[in-house]
């Protein structure tokens, strides 16, 4: 931690700080030793813990589903095969009910989004001190100061991760809009709606207003996707940290909050997936 006996503020700040690698203007290339150093590294700094856990959990998801696909049987399926089939059927039904286009990419994309975000959210149930303390001990073996070893284990509590996923969805929204309506149709949607007039001069005057409203609506989609997921998981992680600080009573409270938090973990993954499907369905609709 920030010391042998950290204050409550230091304890919280330490748990909410990412392991940041980047180019510091004074210290050169390396790991940040404080939140201020991480900030001074600027935009191109990398959160190693977020990258590591998100990629690792993504690989775990791919390996798990590939293993089930390779060992699938037509007889009595095992528990894991039942679970995977249930997940695939659930997501497929959600896509069929919500997406009205013809793309075959949406169902596997939705399955990937739901499972990947669910696994990242699930890391919030790991005891808050376990992996950070393990990282500190490993850092000490390599000669690092344990007080300056930061390690966050929930990728979705990092706004950079949630914003990165939402920007990928935003890029797909633009792609499907242009593919479905053409570039001219996409631009017309941005400039000729919601207000229109039969008089060409009046319509020309309305173009900036329409563009401003439609641009705000379009940009609000990835921002709301990112901040909703980040805010809910960040708040959940903060509550776990606060519970860990109260001593003897932390175990029953931790269990109670973890039980409730399972609903949040699942619900937020589902909401992100469903909104992605809805946005992509809207992008393919022609007005």
Curated annotation (Swiss-Prot):
It is a multi-pass membrane protein. Its main location: membrane. It comes from the Bacteria. It is found in: Cell inner membrane. PROSITE patterns: ATPASE_A. GO terms for molecular function: proton-transporting ATP synthase activity, rotational mechanism. InterPro entries: ATP_syn_F0_a_bact/chloroplast, ATP_synth_F0_asu, ATP_synth_F0_asu_AS, F0_ATP_A_sf. The chain crosses the membrane at residues 45-65, 106-126, 158-178, 238-258, 260-280. HAMAP family: ATP_synth_a_bact (MF_01393). PANTHER family: ATP SYNTHASE SUBUNIT A, CHLOROPLASTIC. Key component of the proton channel; it plays a direct role in the translocation of protons across the membrane. This is ATP synthase subunit a. It comes from Chromohalobacter salexigens (strain ATCC BAA-138 / DSM 3043 / CIP 106854 / NCIMB 13768 / 1H11). The gene is atpB.
């Amino acid at each position: 931690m920030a010391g042998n006996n950290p204050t409550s503020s230091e304890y919280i700040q330490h748990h909410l700080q990412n392991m940041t690698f980047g180019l510091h203007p004074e210290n050169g290339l390396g790991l940040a030793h404080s939140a201020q150093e991480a900030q001074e590294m600027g935009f191109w700094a990398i959160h190693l813990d977020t990258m590591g856990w998100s990629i690792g959990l993504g690989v775990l998801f791919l390996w798990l589903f590939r293993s089930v696909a390779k060992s699938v049987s037509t007889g009595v399926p095992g528990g894991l095969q039942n679970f995977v089939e249930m997940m695939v059927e659930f997501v497929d039904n959600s896509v069929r009910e919500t997406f009205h286009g013809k793309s075959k990419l949406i169902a596997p994309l939705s399955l990937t989004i739901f499972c990947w975000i669910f696994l990242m959210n699930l890391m919030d149930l790991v005891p808050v001190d376990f992996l950070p303390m393990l990282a500190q001990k490993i850092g000490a073996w390599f000669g690092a100061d344990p007080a300056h070893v930061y390690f966050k284990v929930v990728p979705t509590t990092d706004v950079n991760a949630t914003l990165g996923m939402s920007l990928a969805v935003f890029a797909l929204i633009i792609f499907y809009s242009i593919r479905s309506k053409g570039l001219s149709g996409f631009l017309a949607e941005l400039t000729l709606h919601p207000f229109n007039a039969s008089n060409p001069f009046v319509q020309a005057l309305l173009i900036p207003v329409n563009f401003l409203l439609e641009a705000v609506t379009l940009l609000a989609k990835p921002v709301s996707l990112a901040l909703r997921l980040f805010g809910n998981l960040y708040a959940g992680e903060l509550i776990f940290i606060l519970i860990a600080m109260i001593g003897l009573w932390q175990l029953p409270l931790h269990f109670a909050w973890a039980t409730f938090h399972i609903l949040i973990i699942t619900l937020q993954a589902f909401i992100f997936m469903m909104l992605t499907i809805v946005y992509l369905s809207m992008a393919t609709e022609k007005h």
